Amino acid sequence: MINLFRGLLVVLCFASAMVSAEEKNILVTSGSDRAAPIAVVPFGWQGGSVLPEDMAEIISNDLRNSGYYAPIPKQNMISLPTQASEVIFRDWKALGAQYVMVGNITPAGGRLQIQYALFNVATEQQVLTGNVSGTNDQLRDMAHYIADQSFEKLTGIKGAFSTRMLYVTAERFSENNTRYTLQRSDYDGARAVTLLQSREPILSPRFAPDGKRIAYVSFEQKRPRIFVQHIDTGRREQITNFEGLNGAPAWSPDGSKLAFVLSKDGNPEIYVINLASRQLSRVTNDSSIDTEPFFGKDGSTLYFTSDRGGKPQIYKTNINGGGAERVTFVGNYNANPKLSADEKTLVMIHRQDGFTNFKVAVQDLARGSVKILTDSNLDESPTVAPNGTMVIYATRQQGRGVLMLVSINGRVRLPLPTAQGEVREPSWSPYLN
């Protein structure tokens, strides 16, 4: 489903004049170079029963999803070592592997003890070794942890594979009977649990910076209202109750404020509320549509979408006052801004001049260059991993709303497993303890 604001903004764009003076000649690129081959050998298992999870497969998928590594398929492996002393480096050199990981799982007093080691094939040196223990139910957590440790050791970038994701499903049973469900899962779509069910739409779920609360829009009162919910207890608090549109909540970096969109005074404008004092401040004041706020790291800069220049583009402003500065200049539509962790890259929904397709793209904020990451037609709601290496977004495949993951370097693009029905509105968690 195309975002409500997108539809409204597009209508306004076709009725508006072209933007002229601010256009810049900026390169648009796509594609990327080769990922590093890595072999994650199936872990040895010293127990009797079959384990419920394949550790090596989860680790391989995590490293693949980052876009940095290309796992070597198990069927291509010449040998299957499970500990460091069994690694024959010539086997992995023959396969072109740059790195090889081995591991072993041992039952110990009702728990599982996992030992693992990672090697540089060219130098034949061990670069990482470790131990982790847990229960059968924690196998997936331990696999994500090992992937996080390995990724950080090899790249210097903190791994984001132990994070979570929010999304909304919509299952239509009849014309007037649709069930909306707010789900939380692993970042890769596994282990989904239901946080909220409603017969009315749920929109724009967002994790708080502490990962313990979420904000979202609910139509349960037959009109849009913003709620904050505590994940562990399910306790909810209604934040807004204004006439008209109440939408697009975004957390400040310290979790003390929410930015959102209200139309109580006419057209949609961006406001910020202090959650402790409930003091409401208006940020934008323009005759155009201003929507989709996103906080910068400093807690005072807001990126947002506006058609004030004639077509939807991304701007930034200060919540304490001042004018808005245009950020995007390539294409006739740029919306739904998100920032990478280092704030060097802007992730957005982009439409090129002369085209009708909406795609996920990234803009280098220093150079202004734009790279398109996806090849689908109706992308929306991009959300960025806390380390900035991956993006999850909603799109359509075979007439159904689905979630996709794309690496920020464009090397990997794949669908995420989710429940039946229409799936939309993904939101990536921060790092979790």
Swiss-Prot record:
Position of the signal peptide: 1-21
Predominant subcellular localization, coarse grouping: periplasm
Family: Belongs to the TolB family.
Keyword terms of this UniProt record: Cell cycle, Cell division, Periplasm, Signal
Compartments, record wording: Periplasm
Entry keyword Cell cycle: yes
Oligomer status and interactors: The Tol-Pal system is composed of five core proteins: the inner membrane proteins TolA, TolQ and TolR, the periplasmic protein TolB and the outer membrane protein Pal. They form a network linking the inner and outer membranes and the peptidoglycan layer.
Top-level lineage group: Bacteria
Lineage: Bacteria, Pseudomonadati, Pseudomonadota, Gammaproteobacteria, Pseudomonadales
GO cellular component: periplasmic space
Name of this protein: Tol-Pal system protein TolB
GO BP term, example: cell division
InterPro entries xrefs: 6-blade_b-propeller_TolB-like (IPR011042), PD40 (IPR011659), Tol-Pal_TolB (IPR014167), TolB_N (IPR007195)
Functional description taken from the UniProt entry: Part of the Tol-Pal system, which plays a role in outer membrane invagination during cell division and is important for maintaining outer membrane integrity.
